[in-house]
Every structure is written in structure tokens, then in C-alpha cells.
């Protein structure tokens, strides 16, 4: 597994001062250009959740779709989307959350989650945990539970994992990067 994790980490490029000065952007598009790294990413997440009683996989906009859909397919589970407002065609439920400078909102279809669903949330990167916390609230409002979330990248110093653990969500991340 260490070899796979090394391949994954080395396939992610770090772009300094993007999108603004002082930020190091972790670019997963370069991981997608290396089929062995992309496959290892999906395989490791699938193996982690194969026997956890998950009933639905949920991906957050937009890079969570890239990793969530193939994981759901490999697990033989339905895949649902969490999107920014006005991107879904049917009736939706929304949840607002605070950003560093302002507020954002996420939506999902009202029929995406059934009472008692055990949902796995997947996203590319865990920073502060705000997006996933809002997603957990959406799932709970629809009668589901979130005990697990998976990420390709974790930025531990931003505290997202602790924030999600405090909500009862166990986080699985493939690689950690210091600095943000």
C-alpha cells in the first residue's frame, strides 16, 4: 500500500500562490493524468468501505464527483450529487454554511436520501470541513446518517478532520499535505 500511496502523492502537483498569494494549491488533475495513480486512489477507497454497510455514496461539487462515482460503481451502490444552488433539475433541499469570507449554499435532491441510509461522503480535499459539515446536515435532514467520509488529500493544520470527528464522522484520507 505504501507504494500506491507514494504514487498517489507524487502524482499530485503543488502550485504555489494559486489562487492567491500564500496559498499552495494541490492539483488533483495531474493525478487523473496517471491512470495507475487514479486507479490506486479508487481501489484504496473501495477497499476501505467494502464491508461498512454503506447504502449510498455521495459526492460533493465538483471534484467529489470524479472520485465518488467510480467508488459507488465499484461498490455496487447508488451515487448522489451535492451541488451548488440551481444546478439540480428536481426539487431540492438546501443548506447554507459559513466560509472564511462570506457564506455558500449546497443543494441535493429531496429524494436522494432515504430514511436510514448509511451514507459515505467523498471529496477530493479536506481543509476546514465546512462543505462536508453542510453535506452531513443535508443527509441528516433527509433521514440518513453519515459515519464515514473519504478524501484523497487532507490539509491537517486546517482542522477539518477534528471538526468532522466532532460530528461523529470518521475520516479516511489517502495523503496529507502540510501548508495550505
From Swiss-Prot:
Catalytic reaction equation(s): AMP + diphosphate = 5-phospho-alpha-D-ribose 1-diphosphate + adenine
Protein EC: 2.4.2.7
GO cellular component, one term: cytosol
Pfam short name (any one): Pribosyltran
Pathway(s) per entry: Purine metabolism; AMP biosynthesis via salvage pathway; AMP from adenine: step 1/1
GO BP terms: adenine salvage; AMP salvage; purine ribonucleoside salvage
Enzyme class, spelled out: transferase
Molecular function via GO: adenine phosphoribosyltransferase activity
Keyword flag Cytoplasm: yes
Alphabetically ordered keywords of this record: Cytoplasm, Glycosyltransferase, Purine salvage, Transferase
Subcellular location: Cytoplasm
Family according to the record: Belongs to the purine/pyrimidine phosphoribosyltransferase family.
PANTHER family assigned to the protein according to its UniProt record, in alphabetical order: ADENINE PHOSPHORIBOSYLTRANSFERASE (PTHR11776), PHOSPHORIBOSYLTRANSFERASE DOMAIN-CONTAINING PROTEIN (PTHR11776:SF7)
Complex formation: Homodimer.
Protein purpose: Catalyzes a salvage reaction resulting in the formation of AMP, that is energically less costly than de novo synthesis.
Protein name, UniProt field: Adenine phosphoribosyltransferase
Gene: apt
